[in-house]
Amino acid sequence: MAVTKAKKIEVTEKLTEDFKKANHAIVGTFNKLTVSKDYELRKAVRSVGGKYSVVKNTLAERAAKGTKIEDAVKGLAGVTSVAFTDGDPVQLAKVLSKYAKDNPEYEFKAGVVDGKVIKLADIDALANMPSKEELYSKLLFLISAPAQRLVTVMNATGRDLAVVLNQGVEKQKFSGGEAPAQ
């Protein structure tokens, strides 16, 4: 059954809308992917706030005109799928890299991060990076650690004095008795 021109226009408009919202995308291809594996991939991409579409190459090129994804979808051949997000590109890359390792029939064609086309090797490097949340927590720790150490040192002086006084009282060195002989 042939797809009507109206349906193609509708698909192109929806893709254009999605591509304009997306800052990051990973273009892939697959061979002999089963329905259950495709569903698994879509579910994984949705779990990190992304969208996944299998698209015709010409429709993808038309839809991507004037968007950040335009350079990544130029001149595509074969079966093409696009996973895109306006959220964290690291999470998307992690999900797709894990899926590609588990399913050799899925391969990367191109990637876009913040509107810049990245190499295929960079997709794996992106997947190995910590997520934004992990980076924020590490940064917060690095910022708070010196202040925490300062408070510990400041408290140590008072604590050490209290320990010395307590030991003196326990050994009765501070009892108002006679002075030691000189």
Curated annotation (Swiss-Prot):
InterPro entries: Ribosomal_uL10 (IPR001790), Ribosomal_uL10-like_sf (IPR043141), Ribosomal_uL10_bac (IPR022973), Ribosomal_uL10_bac_type (IPR047865). Gene3D superfamilies: 3.30.70.1730, 6.10.250.290. GO terms for molecular function: large ribosomal subunit rRNA binding. It holds the Pfam family Ribosomal_L10. The keyword Nucleotidyltransferase does not apply. GO terms for cellular component: ribonucleoprotein complex; ribosome. Keywords: Ribonucleoprotein, Ribosomal protein, RNA-binding, rRNA-binding. One of its GO terms (biological process) is translation. SUPFAM superfamilies: Ribosomal protein L10-like. Belongs to the universal ribosomal protein uL10 family. Forms part of the ribosomal stalk, playing a central role in the interaction of the ribosome with GTP-bound translation factors. Part of the ribosomal stalk of the 50S ribosomal subunit. The N-terminus interacts with L11 and the large rRNA to form the base of the stalk. The C-terminus forms an elongated spine to which L12 dimers bind in a sequential fashion forming a multimeric L10(L12)X complex. NCBIfam families: PRK00099.1-1. This is Large ribosomal subunit protein uL10. The gene is rplJ.
